[in-house]
Structures are given as structure tokens and as C-alpha cells.
Amino acid sequence: TLCELMRQLVGHGNYASISLADFGKDFMLEPLIHAQAVITDENDVGTYVDKAANLKAVVTGDAININRKFKVPLTYCFHGLVVQCLNEMPRIRDKSDSFYRRQLFIAFTKCFTGVERKYIKQDYLHRQEVLEYVLYKVLNMNYYSFDVPGACENVLEEYKEFNDLVRQFAEEIFPV
């Protein structure tokens, strides 16, 4: 539902859906050229991302090379928002602080199984007045950057341990 709201705000044709795994594959980044945001509802469970350099560069607006089928590759800087929805934490080969500092994990702990109200996603999020209200609130907030809540910092620490077997071992043997 959150991704649908974001897509409606950005507008059709102004977003791309590129999974975490696809950021490391040839020919999968061309949609970035026309996108203002990457909004991905689903990533495969159990995904292992071997190559994270493009993901890191896209998140921070650095230059990347985009290989295009039967066309000349081009260098491109993406200056949009990247949102990836996950059902479980992915394993990433890159365990550096430069990767971790680019991530903001937000845990959605509420479960709506059996009480899903599809009309919210299918009706409300497409209403002009709802979109105008949300956009007004976003544009009229006093902020320069995102604050990182303690809950998000905790999830990041959990993720660092989950993603790094050496760190897991150290936490078990040498608890703080």
C-alpha cells in the first residue's frame, strides 16, 4: 500500500521497479534513465546480492554505467528515491560500512492477514484529493534530511549481524 501511494504521487512512467538482485545484472538498469524513483514491492525471499556497487551508487546519486542492449553504454547519475520492500533480510556480499550507511531499514510489524481492506489500495490511493493532501503534507514539512529513529537503528544492527557470519560469531562469543 505504501508503494502504491508513492507510485501514485510520482506518477505513471516516472518510477521503475528494479529488484535488489537486478542492480548487479547487465541490461537491468536502463529504466533508471526515465525514472524519478525506484519503488519495488517484492524482492525474492532468500536473495543473495553478489554485486552491490550499482545499488550503492544509485542510492547516493553517483555515476553508474548503464549497459543497454544493442546500444552504446552510457554513464548516468540517478537523483531519486530508492524504496525496496522485503519479506526477509537479504544477504549481501558487501559488508562494508559504506554499504550499511546507505540503508534505512523500516520494519513494518503490523500484519493484516484476514482483515485486508483492498479498497484502500484500489480506491483511496487513486483519489485526487488524497494524493493532493499527502503531497501538501510532504512539501510543507520542516526538514532538511531524514531523522533515523532508534527502531531503524536497531533493525540495521540486527541486519549487520544477520548479514555477517563473522559478526554473528563475535556477538555470540563476546557479547557486549
Segments the model singles out, each with a brief description of its role:
Residues 1-176:
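Feature primarily recognizes SF3-like P-loop helicase cores of small DNA viruses
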